[in-house]
Amino acid sequence: MSEPIRVLVTGAAGQIAYSLLYSIGNGSVFGKDQPIILVLLDITPMMGVLDGVLMELQDCALPLLKDVIATDKEDVAFKDLDVAILVGSMPRRDGMERKDLLKANVKIFKCQGAALEKYAKKSVKVIVVGNPANTNCLTACKSAPSIPKENFSCLTRLDHNRAKAQIALKLGVTSDDVKNVIIWGNHSSTQYPDVSHAKVKLHGKEVGVYDALKDDSWLKGEFITTVQQRGAAVIKARKLSSAMSAAKAICDHVRDIWFGTPEGEFVSMGIISDGNPYGVPDDLLYSFPVTIKNKTWKVVEGLTINDFSREKMDLTAKELAEEKETAFEFLSSA
C-alpha cells in the first residue's frame, strides 16, 4: 500500500459532496490501492449535518479510508493537501444578479486561495466546482501565487459528458462510443459545445459526428442550446441542481488528472489560457480540449476552427473577460 494522500472536499455537507464522497472513499477516483485521508470542510452552521455525513462514511467501513476529518477551520482543512476539490460556494438566490453572486464568491475563493498558499503542498491539484467556476478558479489561483497555475482547473466535464450523452442518444449508441467532444470557454450558458472534431463508433468503425448524424442544423442549433441549458432544465424538473451527474463528472475529471487520458482521446477542463494556440486571450480560466499525462495537462493542438466556432469561442471568452474584470474590481477594493 502506498502512503495516504490528503484530499479535501469543501461544501462537504452539500448535495454534490453527498454523491461524491463515497466514490472517492471506495477507490473509484485515485485507484484501489491508494489510501486516503478525507478532509471535509463546511461553514459552521452546517457542522451538525457534516457530523451525519462523517458517521455515514465511517459506517461505509471503506478499507481505503484511513481517516475522515470534519472541520469548519481553514488551517485544519488545507494543511498538507495533495488534492483540493472546491465544491462549496455561495448559491445564486432568487433575484440575485450574477454580479452579486460573483462578489460573494470572489471573497470565498480569495480566502481559500490564500489558505492553499499558506497550508497546502505546493504540488496540490486544485479542482474548482463551485459556481461561477471559471472565475472562482482564477481568483483562487491568483491568491496562491506560489502554487503553479497549471495545478488549478475547473469543472467543465459535466458539460462535456452532457454533450457526449446528447450525441449518443441521438444516434442510439452508448456514451462510451462517443469521444472527443469539446467544451470551449465558460461553464455558463455561453459555453460552446463543439462536436466538429468528435468521433462516434458505428458498426465497429469510427466516423465523425457530423458525418454520422447528417443533421447540421440540429448540431449547430438545438444540440448546443440543450447542452448550454441542461443545468437549468434539471433544476426546473427536480427543483434541485444537478448533484449525481456533477459528482460523476468530478470523479472523471480528477481520475483523468491522476491517471491520464486514454491514447487518442481528449477531455474538456477549464485551465489557464496563457499561450494557448486558439487565439483565446491570456490570463483567463477557459475550457479547452486537453490530454493529460504524468498529472500534467496539455492543450490539444492543430484543431481547425471554422467561422461558426470562432464566433462562439470569442463570445464565451468575452464573457469570461467581463467576469474577471468585475471579480478583480471587488478583489482590489476588498
Swiss-Prot record:
The keyword Ubl conjugation applies. GO terms for biological process: malate metabolic process; malate-aspartate shuttle; NADH metabolic process; NADP metabolic process; oxaloacetate metabolic process; tricarboxylic acid cycle. The active site is at H187. The modification N6-acetyllysine is found at K118, K121, K298. ISGylated. The keyword Plastid does not apply. GO terms for molecular function: hydroxyphenylpyruvate reductase activity; L-malate dehydrogenase (NAD+) activity. The modification Omega-N-methylarginine is found at R230. It catalyses: (S)-malate + NAD(+) = oxaloacetate + NADH + H(+); (2R)-2-hydroxy-3-(4-hydroxyphenyl)propanoate + NAD(+) = 3-(4-hydroxyphenyl)pyruvate + NADH + H(+); (S)-2-hydroxyglutarate + NAD(+) = 2-oxoglutarate + NADH + H(+). InterPro entries: L-lactate/malate_DH (IPR001557), Lactate/malate_DH_C (IPR022383), Lactate/malate_DH_N (IPR001236), Lactate_DH/Glyco_Ohase_4_C (IPR015955), Malate_DH_AS (IPR001252), Malate_DH_NAD-dep_euk (IPR011274), Malate_DH_type2 (IPR010945), NAD(P)-bd_dom_sf (IPR036291). It is found in: Cytoplasm, Cytosol. Keywords: Acetylation, Cytoplasm, Methylation, NAD, Oxidoreductase, Phosphoprotein, Tricarboxylic acid cycle, Ubl conjugation. One of its GO terms (cellular component) is centrosome. Catalyzes the reduction of aromatic alpha-keto acids in the presence of NADH. Plays essential roles in the malate-aspartate shuttle and the tricarboxylic acid cycle, important in mitochondrial NADH supply for oxidative phosphorylation. Catalyzes the reduction of 2-oxoglutarate to 2-hydroxyglutarate, leading to elevated reactive oxygen species (ROS). Homodimer. HAMAP family: Malate_dehydrog_2 (MF_01517). This is Malate dehydrogenase, cytoplasmic. It comes from Felis catus. The gene is MDH1.
